[in-house]
Curated annotation (Swiss-Prot):
Entries under InterPro entries matching the protein: AAA+_ATPase, ABC_carbohydrate_import_ATPase, ABC_transporter-like_ATP-bd, ABC_transporter-like_CS, P-loop_NTPase
The gene coding this protein: araG
Membrane-related topology note: Peripheral membrane protein
Location in or out of the cell: Cell inner membrane
Function, in words: Part of the ABC transporter complex AraFGH involved in arabinose import. Responsible for energy coupling to the transport system.
Pfam families in alphabetical order: ABC_tran
Top-level EC class: translocase
Enzyme Commission code: 7.5.2.12
GO molecular function, one term: ATP binding
Taxonomic lineage of the native organism: Bacteria, Pseudomonadati, Pseudomonadota, Gammaproteobacteria, Pseudomonadales
Keywords: ATP-binding, Cell inner membrane, Cell membrane, Membrane, Nucleotide-binding, Repeat, Sugar transport, Translocase, Transport
Record protein name field: Arabinose import ATP-binding protein AraG
Record domain ABC transporter: where: 16-251, 251-507
Amino acid sequence: MHAQVQTQEHSASGSLRFNGIGKTFPGVKALDGISFVAHPGQVHALMGENGAGKSTLLKILGGAYIPSSGELQIGEQTMAFKSTADSIGSGVAVIHQELHLVPEMTVAENLFLGHLPASFGLINRGALRQQALACLKGLADEIDPQTKVGRLSLGQRQLVEIAKALSRGAHVIAFDEPTSSLSAREIDRLMAIIGRLRDEGKVVLYVSHRMEEVFRICDAVTVFKDGRYVRTFDDMSQLTHDQLVTCMVGRDIQDIYDYRGRPRGAVALRVDGLLGPGLREPISFDAHKGEILGLFGLVGAGRTELFRLLSGLERNTAGRLELRGHELKLRSPRDAIAAGILLCPEDRKKEGIIPLASVAENINISARGAHSGLGCLLRGIWEKGNAEKQIKALKVKTPHAGQQIKFLSGGNQQKAILGRWLSMPMKVLLLDEPTRGIDIGAKAEIYQIIHNLAADGISVIVVSSDLMEVMGISDRILVLCEGALRGEVSRDQANESNLLQLALPRHRADGVAN
C-alpha cells in the first residue's frame, strides 16, 4: 500500500515491541499476552471491536497504566513506564480523542507548558512566540501562537497537540480515533501529516474504526479480539476489506449485514414532487412497509436535507407527502413524531444524545409527553421499566440505566437513541449515517435491530455514505446527486460501479467512465 521508509538501522534500533503484555483489573483481564512489533517508517493500525483492548494498550504505552505482565521495548531498550512523564521523556506521544490542552491558555503556552522560557523569573514572551512559531512551521502555519486554544477548531487543536509532541522529541506517536470529529478537509490534512511522520521515520500507531482510513494511510494492521492478539497483516496491498472484517469479528461479512429477504408491503410513505432547502429538483419515491430503503450519495448530494424535510425540521416549498394513504403536512418535528416518522440524526453527539443525562433519561425523553397523564409515581415506574426493557432488548452495554450516556461507546449511544424511538409508535424510521464512528461488532448489532424493525412492518430509510453498508442491508437503493434523485437500483443490480456512476456529478462520472 505504502512504501516503507525505513533502514536496517531503524528496524534494528527503533522498533516498538510489545512482548506478552497483559493487564488485569479486578475481575477483568483487559489484555492477555499481546505481542507484536511496529517499525519506524510505518503507520501501524490497531483494530478490533470495542473492548478488544486497543485503548488499554495505548494507556500502557502512554504510561497511564502499568502492565500486569510482559514488557515494552523501544529499540533495544526495555521500558518500565510508571507515569505519563516517563513515557513522554522516552519519546512517546499518545494523541487521545479527548485532547489534553488547556482551552484558557494560548497555543504557545500549551506547547511549552511545564518548561516555558523565562528571564529573571518572568516568562519571556518574545522567545515563547518564536519557539512556538518554529514548532508550528509546516504543520499549522495559519495558527497564531497568541490565540487561546479554546477559540480553535477541533482539527486545529489536534495539530497543536501533534506539534507539542514533536517539540518534545517524540519518535513514537499513537493516534486514538483521531478523525472522529473532523471535517473531510481536516481529515485530508491529518492524513498528509501522518504520511509525513512516516516519511520522517517515526513509529506511528493508528487506532480507528474507519476501514477506509486504515486502507488509505496504514502500512500494517494488527487485530485484537477480547484482549488477545489475533493477527498482524504486514502487506495491506494483499488485504481486502472482507478479510479484515472477518478477522476482527470471526464472521463472514455477509453474516454481519444479516440481510433477510422479506416480501414488500403496501406503501408506507409516498413522496411526490418534494422540494425544499438543499434540493435542486423535485423528488418523488415510495417507501414500503417492511422495507429497508437505502439512500446513497456523496457529500452535498442532499440526503440529510431530504431527511430534514421528511422529519419536519425544514418546511417543503413544493410537493406533498402521504403516510399510509393519507396526506401529511409537516410544520415541525413534533408533527412528524406525532405521525410516527422518527429521525435518528447524523451527529448523535450534537443532535441525538443529551450527554449529561442518564441512559434512561435519553431513552425516555421523547415518550414523556405521551405518559404525562400518569402522574409522577406511575410515570416513574413506567420510565424505569421502559429503560430497562430497551437496554435489554437492544443489548446496550452500560453498568446501569442511571449511567451518564456520555460515558458509553458510540455504538451503545446509538442503540440508546434507537431505544428512544422504539418507546413510541413508529411507522417510518429515518436513520442518517447510523453506524458512523462505530466499531464493526456494534455495527452488526445495529444491522440486526434494523432488520427486526423491518420484519415488524416498519418502513426504514437509511442514509449511508458507506457503499458496502448500503448494498449490504438495503432492499432498494435510491441515489442522490447535487440535490436531485438520479436513479433507483434494486438490491440484485447494485454494485460499486453503477452506484458511483449515479452518485457522481455528470462531468466527473463521464471521466470515470472513460
